[in-house]
């Protein structure tokens, strides 16, 4: 699946979910394209779906934070807290782009964000649908030779916060 033009992370995820539904996929795995994650760890994210009937497995970068740049650590922790305000989630790393999804998750998850807010929105949708979410510790490589996201951390954070506010407003509309 490839868009001719970069339409955003959420748009790419939306295309993947649509393709997975149309293909009747049993499991899909998402991995950010910035080179931070190790594809050889994909089996770690698939195993809980197959053996424990988990619906979503999130790669957890926070069990080993010593390598994470301080600005990322602060930003991710902040976004984790905001995401957990929208829906009760027992997840340490809500912003990880290394995940696996079961067939049930593929069918039930709904999201509208075309940008980076999709990661939070997907977990919020999963919680609303009572899907079982777990985490697996993963290895992260932060020095990827400039391949990491070029998005400004402040605009990235703002985009995610706006997406979460939309989800909170849908859950608790003004009367």
Residue ranges of model-derived segments:
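A generic structural signal for short, solvent-exposed coil/turn residues
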Residues: 1, 83, 130-132
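Acceptor/aglycone-binding surface of glycosyltransferases and processive sugar-polymer synthases
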Residues: 3-23, 27-29, 39-116, 142-159
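The conserved acidic donor/metal-binding loop of glycosyltransferases
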Residues: 32-36
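Hydrophobic helical membrane-anchoring modules
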Residues: 88, 112-175
């Amino acid at each position: 699946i490839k868009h001719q033009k970069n339409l955003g992370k959420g748009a790419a995820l939306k295309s993947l979910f649509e393709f997975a539904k149309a293909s009747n996929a049993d499991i899909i795995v998402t991995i950010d394209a910035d080179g931070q994650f190790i594809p050889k760890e994909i089996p770690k994210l698939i195993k809980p779906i197959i053996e424990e009937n988990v619906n979503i497995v999130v790669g957890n970068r926070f069990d080993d934070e010593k390598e994470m740049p301080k600005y990322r650590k602060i930003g991710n922790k902040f976004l984790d807290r905001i995401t957990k305000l929208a829906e009760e989630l027992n997840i340490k790393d809500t912003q990880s782009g290394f995940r696996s999804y079961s067939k049930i998750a593929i069918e039930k998850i709904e999201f509208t964000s075309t940008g980076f807010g999709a990661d939070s929105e997907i977990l919020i949708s999963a919680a609303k649908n009572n899907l079982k979410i777990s985490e697996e510790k993963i290895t992260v490589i932060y020095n990827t030779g400039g391949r990491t996201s070029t998005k400004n951390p402040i605009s990235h954070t703002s985009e995610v916060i706006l997406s979460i506010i939309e989800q909170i407003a849908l859950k608790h509309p003004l009367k």
